[in-house]
Amino acid sequence: MKVAVLGAAGGIGQALALLLKTQLPSGSELSLYDIAPVTPGVAVDLSHIPTDVKIKGFSGEDAKPALEGADVVLISAGVARKPGMDRSDLFNVNAGIVKNLIQQVATTCPKACIGIITNPVNTTVAIAAEVLKKAGVYDKNKLFGVTTLDIIRSNTFVAELKGKKPAELDVPVIGGHSGVTILPLLSQIPGVNFTDQEVADLTKRIQNAGTEVVEAKAGGGSATLSMGQAAARFGLSLVRALQGEQGVVECAYVEGDGEYARFFSQPLLLGKNGIEERKPIGTLSAYEQQALEGMLDTLKKDIALGEEFVNK
């Protein structure tokens, strides 16, 4: 199994690469790419960690050598948020980066499963889909927007509030991956009850958690370490499913039946070909139903922005 990380010299990319080097199944290959000249050195650094995962690093304009034979491609390349920016402010720079990298994926490893981490995910996933479609290699069961950070934050914050162990929780989060489009389904956590005020406060905290980190880092970056952990969890789940493990479920932002929007985050059963089944979002509380209806305009605009970027 070969996993490629594009954007591997950045804060998320290095954290992700470290976790993959230590946690990928024995015999896996890990390929690191970034435009930054330090990237081969990051690979050398990680190569000293005693795990049976082969690692190579590539830098420069051409990602293709890193992509050859990749089964999974995780893309974290791009600029990070600064205080006062929201994820959509990143669009102008990151849209072009994602488009360029996906064009290289389309020609080099068109059958790979692709996880997009680069923000704004609501939009960059639409860009990736349109680029792959133009290249004639789009498979909607193999393109994912990685929203796992919203899930691990939900698990952490609920555990803190309710005195639970975070590992025992798995809060489904639907919608998109920014602001009001992030909707944790707190009503679906077995054996945990909330007051209306707790639901409103928790939902808001989960939606704004990225900003909490950006402000706490005081201009020194955005969420890189927790995002690296979230991306590793998603990437490792994908690898396990591709290798035939049964019953692997993760939420991610994918193209579905279009009931709510063309792309929508929901629980997915993963399998040997990517998505095996898009699972229903289940019964929502009145609060969740209202929040879902209230986000769809924003989500659809984010998606249209990505489609237009490629097709203009």
From Swiss-Prot:
The keyword NAD applies. One of its GO terms (biological process) is tricarboxylic acid cycle. The keyword Zinc does not apply. It catalyses: (S)-malate + NAD(+) = oxaloacetate + NADH + H(+). GO terms for cellular component: cytoplasm. NCBIfam families: MDH_euk_gproteo. This is Malate dehydrogenase. It comes from Cronobacter sakazakii (strain ATCC BAA-894) (Enterobacter sakazakii). The lineage of its organism: Bacteria, Pseudomonadati, Pseudomonadota, Gammaproteobacteria, Enterobacterales.
